[in-house]
Amino acid sequence: MPLALALVLLCGLGGPGAWGCLQCDQSVLLELRQLRDAIVTKRFHLEGLQARAQALLLSMEGPFFRDYAMNAFVGKVVVDQLEKVATSFKNQAQYIKANSKTDVPLLEELVSFREHAIKELKGALRDYEMKACDHKTCHSFKAEVLDCLYCKKTMPKCVKKKYCFEDGQFRMTLKFQDDNKPRNMVLVGDLVTVGLAILTFLVILIAACTYRQNRKLLLK
């Protein structure tokens, strides 16, 4: 199927660079592939729904969780916590594979499946970030940690404050746009607002002058 091939290429499957966090666990990848093989063509009867389900599952096999971990958080997680997330993820995948839902209800369940996985992964990522960003205690933080970018186990390290918590949104902004663009957009918005205000004032002024001229003509 050409669409499926294009999606595979788009998601960059098959290379270690596409792995991250949950995908570092080969059993998670295997479970996702088996789920995709079991439901996409057999339980979705419309081509549009097949394409959406295929894209959703392939994104989870690809860099989706890695990008989330790196852009919204510092990209590291305690191994023990990640193993719990992975176990829950695989159990949910097996449940979806075994139930009898089809078409739209099944697609909705896949969306909920991904949302639940994000929620659980977020808890593990945030827990590590809170400990690594606490400079009073981070030096004594001991645990086996996984680097979600390289799929390598490492030791926890203190994280600079500029990379912690509220700055996570700033990291996401940097990924998708230059720093100057938001400022330029604000400037353009201000100029448009001022321009519209001036135009409105001129329209009112012209209308008032026209009214006075017409009134004078009527009174003559």
From Swiss-Prot:
Residues 1-20 form the signal peptide. It is a single-pass membrane protein. The chain crosses the membrane at residues 186-206. Keywords: Membrane, Signal, Transmembrane, Transmembrane helix. This is Izumo sperm-egg fusion protein 2. GO terms for cellular component: membrane. Residues 207-220 are cytoplasmic. InterPro entries: IZUMO, IZUMO2. It is found in: Membrane. It comes from the Eukaryota. PANTHER family: IZUMO SPERM-EGG FUSION PROTEIN 2 (PTHR47745:SF1). Residues 21-185 are extracellular. It comes from Mus musculus. Belongs to the Izumo family. Pfam families: IZUMO. Izumo is the name of a Japanese shrine to marriage.
